[in-house]
C-alpha cells in the first residue's frame, strides 16, 4: 500500500514520510496517472538494465566483469528491439554511444509569444511542437534555448523566465528510450523570420484554441496551456517534477 501526503494547507512536511507529496489538489490526478501499466514495464526494466550496464562498463576494472556488463547491455537492447520492432543494431548502437555515468538528457523548449499567440514549428513529419531540442554539451540552458529557436524558426529571442522542469515520463507519450528532463523557458521575440532548414518545414503563431496536430512526445496541449499561464503571470513560480 502506498501513501500520499497532501501539502496544501500544511505548515511543514518535515519528518512525515510518504510515497508521494502532493503540492496541490491537481497533483492527485497526476500521481494516479504516473503509475505504470504492467504491459509497459518491460521498457522500464530494459532502461534499468542499460543503466546498470553503463555504470559497470564505466567503473569496472575487471575485464571479465566488463564482459558481463556488455552482455547485460546487449540484453537490454534485445528487450527494446523485441518490444518495439526497432532494429537491434540501431538500439545497441544508441546504448553504446552513452559515455560515463548515465544521467537524464536535457530537452529545452522555448515558449515565445507575440500578440497573445505562441510560436510553434512544424516538424518534417507534419506535426507541430515548441521550438527546441537536446541541449548541446557546450551550451547553457539559456544559450541552447536561443540556438534552437534560431535554427528551427529563424527568430532571435531573449529568454526571460524559467517556466518549468518536467519529467518526460510523466508528461509525454510515447515513452523515450532515455529519461528526459524537459526545460520550458519563456522568451520574448526580438527579430527574424523563418528560413529554410533541415529540421523544420515552417513556423507559425497559434492561439490557445487553434492548435495544430502536435508531436506529443515533444509538446502537449497541457504544456502549451502551462506556457500561456506563465506568460500571463508576472509572479509565476517555476514548476518542477
Description of each model-found segment:
Residues 15, 20-24:
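Low-complexity, intrinsically disordered or signal/transmembrane-proximal segments
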Residues 63-66, 70-109:
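Acidic, metal-coordinating catalytic segment for phosphate/diphosphate chemistry
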Residues 92-129, 157, 161:
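N-terminal strand-loop-strand
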Residues 5-7, 22:
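Leucine-biased recognition of intrinsically disordered, low-complexity hydrophobic segments
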Residues 33-60, 66-69, 198-241:
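Nudix hydrolase/Nudix homology domain
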Residues 135-159, 167-227, 236-240:
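Unchanged
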Amino acid at each position: 500500500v502506498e501513501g500520499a501526503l497532501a501539502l496544501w494547507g500544511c505548515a511543514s512536511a518535515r519528518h512525515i514520510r510518504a510515497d508521494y507529496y502532493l503540492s496541490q489538489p491537481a497533483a492527485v490526478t497526476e500521481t494516479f496517472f504516473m503509475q505504470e501499466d504492467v504491459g509497459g514495464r518491460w521498457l522500464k526494466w530494459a532502461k534499468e538494465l542499460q543503466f546498470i550496464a553503463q555504470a559497470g562498463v564505466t567503473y569496472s576494472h575487471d575485464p571479465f566483469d566488463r564482459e558481463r556488463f556488455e552482455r547485460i547491455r546487449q540484453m537490454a537492447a534485445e528487450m527494446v528491439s523485441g518490444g518495439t520492432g526497432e532494429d537491434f543494431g540501431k538500439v545497441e548502437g544508441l546504448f553504446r554511444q552513452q559515455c560515463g555515468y548515465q544521467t537524464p538528457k536535457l530537452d529545452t523548449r522555448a515558449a515565445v509569444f507575440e500578440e497573445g499567440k505562441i510560436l510553434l514549428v512544424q516538424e518534417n513529419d507534419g506535426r507541430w511542437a515548441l521550438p527546441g531540442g537536446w541541449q548541446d554539451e557546450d551550451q547553457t540552458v539559456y544559450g541552447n534555448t536561443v540556438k534552437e529557436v534560431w535554427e528551427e524558426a529563424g527568430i532571435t529571442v531573449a529568454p526571460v523566465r524559467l517556466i518549468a522542469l518536467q519529467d518526460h515520463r510523466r508528461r509525454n507519450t510515447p515513452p523515450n528510450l532515455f529519461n528526459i528532463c524537459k526545460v520550458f523557458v519563456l522568451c520574448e521575440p526580438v527579430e527574424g523570420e523563418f528560413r529554410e532548414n533541415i529540421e523544420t518545414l515552417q513556423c507559425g503563431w497559434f492561439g490557445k484554441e487553434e492548435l495544430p496536430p502536435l508531436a506529443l512526445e515533444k509538446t502537449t496541449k497541457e504544456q502549451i496551456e502551462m506556457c500561456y499561464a506563465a506568460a500571463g503571470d508576472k509572479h509565476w513560480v517555476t514548476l518542477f517534477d
